[in-house]
Design a protein with these regions (language model features):
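Hydrophobic, small-residue-rich alpha-helical packing segments that form membrane-like cores
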Residues: 281, 307-311, 315-322, 328, ...
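Edge beta-strands of extracellular beta-sandwich domains
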Residues: 105-113
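Bacterial Sec-dependent N-terminal signal peptides
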Residues: 1-9
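Carboxylate/His-rich catalytic cores and anion/metal-binding grooves
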Residues: 225-247
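Solenoid-like repeat scaffolds
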Residues: 374-382
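Aromatic (Trp/Tyr) and acidic
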Residues: 14-104, 129-194, 198, 236, ...
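Proline-centered turn/helix-capping motifs that create local helix->coil transitions or kinks
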Residues: 242-250, 317-322, 361-364
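Acidic, glycine-anchored loop motifs typical of Ca2+
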Residues: 219, 223
Length: 616
């Protein structure tokens, strides 16, 4: 039932960014009437006049009429009929809400302010601190609720980790402590760890002003931007993965525990591979470039490591390692498959070559890049899409090089411009295909990460001066993807966990995570368990392909296991419109919530990159 507030009733049908809006940005509240999906029986008929109301004084500071989306048709992706209340022209800073003047329904409170997202950025960034492996979380940084001793530092764990398949061979022991739990699982995948480092460095370089030294981590106040401190934490871990030959370990499999320090099973490392080693080259070299003026000795250490690994990868171009594979006798090592295909390995070499050139200025690296750039996905497929961001962003970074060849820059930008203005990208935006202003074609596993990547696709038009004629609208489009993640969606849900202390009103309360797991009295669900998950984790998001395990409903091995299929009613999750294919839950097998609610550092870093563009 709605909550009555001073003769005004808070309504989930009046949807806003729960944190707020920048004064100069487009500001549109969405009014929704459900037509299709689990809430189709509900109804909301808005009044004729809406107002922006100052929360403290209850003064109506701006009034207007609603406009109807698409002549009142039902949007298939959300199952909703939608109206808009546009208050873009009101720019005075303060705390406000939207009011249906006639029917006395109101939205959540939100802020209009020049730095409305800074605290959100801090909390979302701090999730990497909570994901740190082998590092104590002190209460003064983590909060009393999430303080924990360093994890995976016991016998046969990270400090003396042994190779998978050679568990009884002490000669394989290697110190692999540090790095980050990858997602809701605690494994550490080198290919992906490198990506997180690259994207943190990229976010920093693209807008250094957003990345200050006061994000509340142990390194805060050391006169180095906290994002670079976090990068260094990741790079230090990757240096430990390197052998004297230059090869780099592909994966470290970790046991789970709640809290993580309670994990007691051994850790195992997987064999070096070409892809992992090239990933390390890119991270080391990019780090060497950025740290050159900040910490020259550290920069040189990274550069020497990068050169060593480059040479090994050149001599060993096709070394593969498949984890968690019955075929390769690695079942149980990690969860997701970190090995890449031939094209993925090629793009990793391209990234490594680009970053080595930036760090060294040596022509051999950029010559390789320029000779092969047309073989990348974007250039050879003529396609810009959110699942190709690694190569797309790499190519755009080339266009910023002082000595980039003008004809190659022109070629890259031309393809990016043409392929961004297609039916699944800008054309859909211009056609108002999604009434929630954040169109994406598919809602599958990790759709919230895809939203962030889609927003970054559009901000790249601004960042890399690809389509200067639409610079302002491209920025506004990118910002709309942030609003979606902050609550401008059919579920009126902020997809960041537990942000109630920082402006969130209806937040993600549960994620699938080995620490913040189902059944934990301390960390299961925000508002129910003692603490819930920490603030700022991005949940996976709507997934139209979600299903319970194939053993359900009657083949899970026992009556007790079969009963677990019905531990939670999932009818409101299945067979829904795309944007409603989500539920706030964190059950494990056989309900398999990880396909919907699990966090991932990959989602997080893409969101951080996008959000930081709107922070001063």
């Amino acid at each position: 039932m709605p909550l009555a507030i001073f003769a005004q009733t808070q309504s989930k049908y009046i949807v806003v960014d729960q944190f707020g809006y920048l004064p100069e940005s487009k500001k549109i509240a969405i009014i929704r009437d459900p037509q299709v999906g689990f809430d189709a029986a509900e109804t909301f008929k808005p009044g004729k006049t809406y107002a922006l109301v100052e929360a403290k004084t209850k003064k109506q500071v701006f009034k207007g009429k609603l406009t109807l989306w698409n002549e009142g048709k039902t949007d298939p992706s959300s199952g909703d009929k939608v109206w808009y209340f546009n208050f873009t022209n009101y720019k005075k800073e303060g705390t406000y809400y939207i009011l249906d003047v006639e029917k006395r329904f109101k939205s959540y409170d939100f802020v209009i302010g020049a730095n409305v997202y800074k605290e959100v950025l801090k909390q979302a960034f701090k999730t990497f601190y909570y994901q740190r492996d082998g590092f104590a979380k002190e209460a003064k940084y983590a909060g009393e609720g999430w303080a924990d001793a360093a994890s995976h530092m016991g016998k046969k764990q990270d400090p003396n980790c042994r190779q998978w398949g050679l568990e009884n061979d002490a000669s394989t022991e290697k110190d692999v402590h540090g790095g980050w739990y990858d997602a809701g699982d605690f494994n550490k995948y080198t290919n992906w760890t490198s990506d997180y480092i690259i994207y943190m460095l990229l976010a920093y370089e693209e807008n250094p002003a957003a990345w200050t030294d006061d994000f509340g981590i142990p390194e805060s106040g050391n006169k180095i931007p906290d994002v670079l401190d976090e990068v260094a934490f990741g790079l230090d871990y990757m240096l430990r993965l390197q052998f004297s030959s230059g090869s780099v370990i592909s994966i470290v499999g970790e046991a789970e525990g709640s809290p993580p320090s309670s994990a007691s099973e051994p850790s195992y490392w997987g064999s070096p591979s070409t892809s992992a080693t090239l990933s390390a080259v890119a991270a080391f070299a990019y780090g060497a470039k950025v740290f050159k003026t900040i910490n020259p000795s550290y920069s040189n250490k990274l550069l020497q490591a990068a050169k060593l690994s480059w040479d090994w990868a050149e001599a060993n171009p096709n070394m593969k390692f498949y984890n968690n594979s019955a075929e390769h006798k690695t079942q149980g090592l990690g969860a997701g498959q970190q090995e890449v295909d031939d094209l993925g390995r090629f793009e990793k070499k391209m990234q490594a070559a680009l970053r080595m050139y930036e760090a060294t200025g040596e022509e051999k690296y950029i010559t390789y890049f320029e000779q092969h750039y047309k073989e990348t996905k974007m250039m050879s497929w003529s396609l810009v899409f959110p699942f190709g961001e690694y190569g797309q962003d790499m190519l755009l970074c080339y266009t910023k090089l002082p000595k980039a060849k003008p004809e190659i820059v022109k070629d890259i930008k031309a393809i990016y411009a043409v392929e961004t203005d297609t039916i699944n990208n800008l054309f859909a935006i211009k056609d108002h295909t999604d009434p929630y202003f954040a169109f994406q074609k598919d809602y599958v596993w990790g759709s919230n990460g895809t939203k962030a990547k889609q927003g970054n696709i559009y901000y790249n038009l601004v960042q890399y001066n690809v389509m200067p004629e639409i610079k302002d609208s491209a920025r506004s489009i990118a910002e709309s993807y942030i609003h979606y993640l902050h609550g401008v969606n059919p579920l009126s849900t902020c997809y960041l966990t537990n942000m109630y202390m920082f402006g969130g009103d209806k937040c993600t309360n549960q994620i699938y995570h080995g620490w913040f797991k189902n059944g934990s009295k301390k960390w299961d669900e925000a508002t129910v368990s003692t603490f819930g998950p920490p603030p700022g984790f991005i949940a996976g998001g709507p997934n139209t392909e979600y299903n319970w395990d194939g053993c359900c409903p009657e083949g899970c091995g026992s009556k007790e296991n079969n009963a677990m299929c019905f531990e939670l009613d999932i009818k409101n999750l299945k067979n829904q419109p795309q944007q409603k294919s989500y539920m706030d839950f964190n059950q494990g097998w056989p309900l398999n919530s990880w396909a919907v609610s699990e966090n991932s550092n990959s989602y997080q870093v893409q969101y951080l990159r996008l959000l930081s563009k709107f922070v001063k």
